[in-house]
A protein has these predicted regions:
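Glycine- and hydrophobic-rich flexible loops that cap the catalytic core of alpha/beta enzyme folds
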Residues: 1-196
Length: 196
């Protein structure tokens, strides 16, 4: 077993996919219990950087990973997430929200920095492009909404894909059972747009 400290970019940049094994629970993190505190930490670190102060690293917690043997030249490297799937999935939603926020605020020229951490791009090396393009592959229960959420191009697209979850004025319905991926994307995207 190897222990090391990695940045988000180091975790997600290479041509690999983190898979959530079938026995793991579905995505359950929420605004009240996890997202708000994480977002405060993100903004605090960003403000430190903008003010010229070197921020202290943020410890998101330990992640236990199990690399899988590759038995073909084709296919991205696959790593099973034994512990930490809630954190890694949340990071994917945050990165997708940053991308949507950059597009919504006219800063889409910066999205390339984020896109390399969201998608595997070298399709020539993939066995199944529709699956292997994602840096993270969730449990079966979360796959449909995860794919829909990460494939949207902008906020209007998000509203269209999840039209039942929005009012006719484009706001997220209250007291509605939204897919967790939509709730995460909407929460983080709104917050990043306000911050930008």
């Amino acid at each position: 077993m190897k222990s090391e400290t990695l940045t988000i970019q180091q975790i997600f940049q290479n041509q690999r996919q983190y898979r959530v094994p079938f026995y793991q629970r579905a995505y359950v993190w929420t605004q009240r219990n996890q997202w708000s505190a994480l977002l405060e930490d993100i903004f605090e670190k960003a403000q430190s950087r903008l003010s010229g102060t070197k921020p202290t690293p943020h410890f998101l917690g330990a992640v236990v990973l199990e690399p899988q043997l590759k038995n073909s030249l084709l296919g991205v490297d696959t790593i099973h997430i034994i512990d930490g799937q809630q954190r890694l999935t949340t990071l994917q939603y945050i990165l997708a929200s940053i991308r949507l926020s950059l597009r919504a605020t006219g800063l889409s020229e910066l999205e390339g920095l984020v896109l390399t951490c969201l998608k595997n791009t070298n399709e020539a090396t993939m066995r199944n492009k529709k699956v292997e393009c994602f840096k993270l592959w969730p449990t079966f229960r979360d796959q449909t909404h995860f794919i829909q959420s990460l494939n949207v191009d902008n906020i209007d697209d998000l509203r269209n894909v999840f039209s039942d979850s929005f009012t006719q004025h484009g706001t997220l319905r209250k007291h509605f059972n939204h897919p967790p991926s939509l709730e995460a994307l909407w929460f983080f995207t709104e917050a990043f747009i306000k911050w930008i």
